[in-house]
Amino acid sequence: MLQLLKSSWVRSAGSGVVTWRASAGLFCPGTRQASDTSDTLHHPSPSSESQVQPVRVCSMMHLPLQSSPEGLDAAFVGVPLDTGTSNRPGARFGPRRIREESLMLGTVNPSTGALPFQSLRVADLGNVNVNLYNLQDSCRLIREAYQNILATGCIPLTLGGDHTITYPILQAVAKEHGPVGLVHVGAHSNTSDKPLEDKVYHRTPFRRSVDEGLLDSKRVVQIGIRGSSRTLDPYRYSRSQGFRVVLAEDCWMKSLVPLMAEIRQQMGGVPLYISFAIDALDPAYAPGTGTPEIAGLTPSQALEIIRGCQGLNVVGCDLVEVSPPYDLSGNTALLAANLLFEMLCALPKVTTV
């Protein structure tokens, strides 16, 4: 299902030196290969160990690497696909860069009191082996991979990848849970039909999801939408389906805590999927993306949105549209890594103090 670089740590007797040994593979993931579902997976992030940061090989938050979701409550999964991009490419490199920027993340969330690693079994499952030459085949591969993950009860947290990937993920999620609620945070509504004569690309995932009955349309909220358009009412389709559309200008200079209180009430206990495109944020904070739009959300508002989902029945999350070639400082990927950690902290069963 997932193509991984099989690896192991070897410690020389009495030397204290840890040697990285790897066999052939397609993806260079993280620290240690977790081959069983023992209590060792109930752990703080390995970033708490005594090794200095540059010594370790990169996985999300230095989590153990597993080739199977069996026994996990949640897992980080990379989908390095950008062949659905309409403007600037590069999101295929997003998972790798986000993992790199996650290495300094801690194990608890002092702001919310969340203790994810004391509550859940979590690992990094590596990357889905997409087909960069065939978008339709990539969608099939993603859908099948996520069906296997979800069938075990594991909640996937996805590192994208362009927003096309949300469509096959939602196909798998809906097969497991039925139509789901959606909190979509992004600059674009992504409800186009086929403006480029193709029904599947990063501007169409939620249109296709409605077509296939994957969403509970009365429980879909889109936040941060903005930008110029070729029509005066570019959000007509979303609103006609019952989506709540919260424009970026309605968020300017405001706390979004009251908005999220309304959304929590709207969602109730239904299964909820969170899809966060990094272009929701103003490009002053997140320049490394394929289709930036000015006057976006702030990082603190992004935190309010994700933290506002804590306690809801979250069944999956993604963070998409990070394009490292346009992220010279690494700040965009750093934001993405932190937002994924916040998503982990917002999952069901995560205890707080």
Curated annotation (Swiss-Prot):
Gene3D superfamilies: Ureohydrolase domain
Keyword annotations from UniProtKB, A to Z: Acetylation, Arginine metabolism, Hydrolase, Manganese, Metal-binding, Mitochondrion, Transit peptide
GO biological process, one term: urea cycle
E.C. number: 3.5.3.-, 3.5.3.1, 3.5.3.7, 3.5.3.17
Pfam families on file: Arginase
Record's subcellular location: Mitochondrion
Catalysed reactions, semicolon-separated: 3-guanidinopropanoate + H2O = urea + beta-alanine; 4-guanidinobutanoate + H2O = urea + 4-aminobutanoate; taurocyamine + H2O = urea + taurine; L-arginine + H2O = urea + L-ornithine
N6-succinyllysine modification, residue list: 218
Transit peptide residue numbers: 1-33
Family per record: Belongs to the arginase family. Agmatinase subfamily.
Protein name per UniProt: Guanidino acid hydrolase, mitochondrial
Species name: Rattus norvegicus (Rat)
Gene (name only): Agmat
